[in-house]
């Protein structure tokens, strides 16, 4: 169900779109279920019809390109389509049962005229279960060739556009085209989705803001995303002008997948540095708390399709070509490279490394050949042309220097190579060399291992001898961590690469066999089907609680996100609390200080005149017992709040308590051994000196290490380490080590805001003035103790009448409190309303403006 606030934002938001001529959104219209046609041009606030009754499990796979091959029939002039068996989107079906229905959304690799689009759409849906997204030629070029290939692709591969030859500078029009294209994809998904049952799986960096459009329309959509390219470090990514929009787009998913932990770590670091989000690992699953939703992170490299490779290996043409290659290079060691003509594949570095190999090991001349198959470039530009020129020049230089009339150490194959021929080279090669300087995954090593294993029907590959293989792979490619038996190299260190190739070539047969068996076992058990099934299982787990929470849609445009909270969690309003406040005679009010009455700040810490005025108004009512419960020291709080004579203060989390300004400070804690301070201070000081932007606060009862002004990642990392360090050092001391919001605190055992609130309520009961209403407001972890303690205390049988309790957190976030207020301004508005109510016989109409938000 779509929340009303979300639906309202659909009309209010202003998307960053370009005005491209497009096919009307309702043409072609697509049947999702017999007899039901969805029409996204209708009222966006209307309910979505659920068709789950007779539908089977369905996955919607959204990618830039459909897994189809297209051509026009020469005789009829009609378009003909067939499955692209090499497409990952098609191969991932192997991970699911035959009962699972797949629907594909994406573009075709050909341009379809506008007057043919409806006919083609119906044909694709009926025959292939595919939904085509038709982009105009101009939009396609700006979206794919422009933003994707000339801005995102270089940046994600660590190339900054500092010079014209290093990627294009950011172009706002290309970004608008990217957003426009993603919007068209979302329109097509909306036409066919059954949001209550379908799972949507988005593939790769072309569609990183698509989740925002879908989440905006369907708050509880089941949405996964997998990034097939690297994700750069935060220092690189933060240079992107639209960095926040893309991060928020990805965070509108339920599950985000990466090939390696490095890529995931960089993404998490960006979320921490740019959006202030923390993550944690529970039972092996990494999760980001994002406005009440947990966005899970999946780390699993994609695999190959074993059946596809083995079927090609079994072909007679493959066997014949394998024998031909073996005969051609008889008596020589064959090193194989298969790469796209791309500046990131490191082909020229590979050739230079081979040149160093021949320079260093002269005896290998005439005995080693590198066959480099060059796949066509996926994009064009000066950098691709330069890479191609350098590759040919380097190969020619090596062949002229080390070759003979009947021997070429470098064999360049720069043409469209049939699949059977590539497979034959894989099967015949003694060593596979992958030298990319940056690559998302790269499945060449996997294919090489499978082809070296062979099949029983391929007599050219399979005989009675053990299977062997050797791999030299770059440490900068996604498959490297999975290949523990490979020789990993830094592609920039050509001497080390040359040495690695030499080591691979002279490796013993036994060692080659052991390494091969280890690789083949992993690859055969972690194929593309395993990858897809594992991802979908995690996505189902991530979406399990979708309907147990209520949703708010907040934010405009690409800043949209969904706030997901408990059904009982609601905003506390003046209108709701004033009637209870007025009918009760004794009230206890507990207020946090930082982040509740005043904003969190390391600079301005004293309260404003308005805060003091509101507190004075509350304290002047003799029926109110008002306490500030804070972690700050008693001296600071006394000075700041001195005008409020009847205000109670529980300083240092309740270690010191004073009921009124003229009363003496009291503590219920016996003086503890303070030797622990001499143990803690040197540790904290050491971390402070090592971590720029941190400080130590010396309290009478505690020591606090603050890292609010430190680098977010480094400060958080240091806080975790110091927590472990101090817990170990203080294991036998009567103190506890607590981590709070940007702090690590060491304090005596049994000191907490919850216990302080309990003490106040207990003393009110003993005085014969049990509270009839209790309100507590706070914003951080320490206040959760107060909420929990008060909620349990008020059920005490000593209280003859159970008081009304209003536990309220500041900020819409998961909490033990039942209510929330948005910020400090909201808190003051509420307190001002209560103060005015104390001095008036009737509720003031000017303070009944805030009401419960409508939640659907």
Curated annotation (Swiss-Prot):
Annotated Gene3D superfamilies: Glycogen Phosphorylase B, HAD superfamily/HAD-like
Phosphoserine sites (modified residues): 5
Highest taxon listed in the record's lineage: Eukaryota
Tissue specificity note: Expressed in leaves, roots, stems and flowers.
This protein's record includes keyword Glycosyltransferase: yes
Enzyme type, top EC level: transferase
A GO BP entry: trehalose biosynthetic process
Positions of the UniProt region annotated as Glycosyltransferase: 57-541
The keyword GTP-binding is assigned to this record: no
Catalysed reaction, written as an equation: D-glucose 6-phosphate + UDP-alpha-D-glucose = alpha,alpha-trehalose 6-phosphate + UDP + H(+)
Keywords: Glycosyltransferase, Phosphoprotein, Transferase
Protein family according to the UniProt entry: In the N-terminal section; belongs to the glycosyltransferase 20 family. In the C-terminal section; belongs to the trehalose phosphatase family.
Protein name, as recorded: Probable alpha,alpha-trehalose-phosphate synthase [UDP-forming] 8
Gene from which this protein is expressed: TPS8
